[in-house]
């Protein structure tokens, strides 16, 4: 009888580490583990490989997808100013790419199942499975943590029983996810929205009170909506994002603490560190204000909001997302220029912006310019708000 193989999306954390053994113990699968490199720390890639080999997987793969993630996902998110309830979608953006890589490998090795470590209350189950079912509908999806209805405490107990080293305990049961675009921290005491996030939860950003005592200026150059240089230095995609993370992070910029609405309908308290994401999106929006017309800006704001909503829900493969990209790409053909930001102890302000495609006209807007005759505006002003004036008259009768 041919052995059953499950390809497991493996991060080395508590959930997926438990899945390594659960797939064997409860489902009778042999496991192939996969870590997809989307910019997480090197140790976060070495650790899964070492753990996987220790626990006897058939094979462990590490797939380098950093460049693809930066160019095909992050840069699209920047052009869309993609923020969901103030969150720049760091985890959400990476999930479809990870799912695609896992599904492709599962097909390649002839796997019977694809597995992930998502719980039944989180968003990632939707993000992974919507893509996996679209790409590999013939392959079963197994989610042991969800399907066995395990709690965090039960997982920790199971891990200890099986001798699985995990980076959490009952005192600090934080769940941390990290990639090129940001870092998320959730769980444990953070589930109480009245509890301040402990300093030790943060790794990318210094506490604003501890940041340097002088302002730092950073200049971002854009070409067709994509960041291409920092302070005049042209950089490749991955290097550029890492550099911006470093600059913003040392100034305490990029911490997000929100209560967000999950796909399932639950509200969840989430902490994020996204210094580079927040800086680049802020800079990009400032450039758009200089270049796009009022009607374009108003409509694009609606498009951007829907775009972020689709990404958050895991609907990267939804045709509407491609349609929105087509509109966004058209607006970005004129998005060429530079933006200067001033960073200081957690604050970020626009200090300057310029573009050869700017609709902003300094001469025309000047109070000293007579090119626009002010007297010609009288008729326009007279009838501005006409319907409201008519309504007001009716209410006085």
Curated annotation (Swiss-Prot):
Enzyme class, broadest EC rank: ligase
Domain of life: Archaea
Pathway of action: Amino-acid biosynthesis; L-arginine biosynthesis; L-arginine from L-ornithine and carbamoyl phosphate: step 2/3
One Pfam match: Arginosuc_syn_C
Disulfide bridges in this chain: none
Main location: cytoplasm
Annotated EC: 6.3.4.5
Amino-acid positions noted as binding ATP in the UniProt annotation, renumbered to this chain: 9-17, 117
GO terms of biological process kind: argininosuccinate metabolic process; L-arginine biosynthetic process; urea cycle
Compartments reported by the entry: Cytoplasm
GO molecular function annotation: argininosuccinate synthase activity; ATP binding
Catalytic activity reported: L-citrulline + L-aspartate + ATP = 2-(N(omega)-L-arginino)succinate + AMP + diphosphate + H(+)
Record: residues binding L-aspartate: 119, 123-124
Keywords for the protein's UniProt record, in alphabetical order: Amino-acid biosynthesis, Arginine biosynthesis, ATP-binding, Cytoplasm, Ligase, Nucleotide-binding
Residues bound to L-citrulline: 87, 123, 127, 175, 184, 260, 272
Any single Gene Ontology cellular-component annotation: cytoplasm
UniProt-listed InterPro entries: Arginosuc_syn_C (IPR048268), Arginosuc_syn_N (IPR048267), Arginosuc_synth (IPR001518), Arginosuc_synth_CS (IPR018223), Arginosuc_synth_type_1_subfam (IPR023434), AS_cat/multimer_dom_body (IPR024074), Rossmann-like_a/b/a_fold (IPR014729)
Family (UniProt): Belongs to the argininosuccinate synthase family. Type 1 subfamily.
NCBIfam families: argG, PRK00509.1, PRK13820.1
Quaternary structure and partners: Homotetramer.
Protein name listed in UniProt: Argininosuccinate synthase
Species: Methanococcus maripaludis (strain DSM 14266 / JCM 13030 / NBRC 101832 / S2 / LL)
């Amino acid at each position: 009888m041919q052995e059953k193989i499950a390809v497991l999306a493996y991060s080395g954390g508590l959930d997926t580490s438990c899945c390594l053994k659960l797939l064997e113990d409860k489902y009778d699968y042999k496991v192939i583990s996969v870590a997809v490199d989307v910019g997480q720390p090197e140790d976060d890639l070495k650790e899964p490989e070492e753990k996987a080999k220790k626990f006897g997987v058939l094979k462990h793969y590490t797939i380098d997808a950093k460049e693809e993630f930066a160019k095909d996902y992050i840069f699209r998110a920047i052009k869309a100013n993609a923020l969901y309830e103030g969150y720049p979608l760091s985890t959400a953006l990476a999930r479809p790419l990870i799912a695609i890589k896992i599904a492709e490998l599962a097909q390649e090795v002839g796997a019977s199942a694809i597995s992930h470590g998502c719980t039944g209350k989180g968003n990632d189950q939707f993000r992974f499975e919507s893509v996996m079912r679209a790409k590999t509908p013939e392959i079963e999806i197994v989610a042991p943590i969800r399907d066995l209805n395990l709690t965090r405490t039960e997982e920790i107990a199971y891990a200890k029983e099986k001798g699985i080293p995990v980076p959490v305990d009952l005192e600090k049961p934080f769940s941390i996810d990290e990639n090129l675009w940001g870092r998320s921290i959730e769980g444990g005491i953070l589930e109480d929205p009245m509890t301040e996030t402990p300093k030790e939860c943060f790794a990318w950003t210094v506490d604003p009170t501890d940041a340097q005592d002088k302002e730092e200026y950073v200049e971002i150059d854009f070409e067709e909506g994509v960041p291409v240089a920092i302070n005049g230095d042209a950089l490749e995609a991955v290097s550029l994002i890492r550099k911006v993370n470093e600059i913003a992070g040392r100034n305490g910029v990029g911490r997000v603490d929100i209560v967000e609405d999950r796909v399932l309908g639950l509200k969840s308290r989430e902490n994020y560190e996204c210094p580079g994401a927040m800086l680049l999106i802020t800079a990009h929006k400032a450039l758009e204000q200089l270049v796009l017309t009022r009607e374009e800006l108003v409509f694009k704001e609606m498009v951007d909001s829907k775009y972020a909503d689709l990404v958050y829900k895991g609907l990267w493969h939804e045709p509407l997302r491609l349609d929105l990209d087509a509109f966004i790409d058209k607006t970005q053909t004129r998005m060429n220029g530079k933006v200067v930001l001033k960073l200081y102890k957690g604050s970020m302000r626009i200090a300057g912006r310029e573009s050869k495609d700017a609709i902003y006209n300094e001469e025309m807007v000047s109070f000293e310019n007579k090119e626009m005759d002010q007297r010609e505006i009288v008729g326009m002003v007279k009838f501005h708000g006409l319907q409201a004036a008519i309504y007001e008259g009716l209410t006085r009768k």
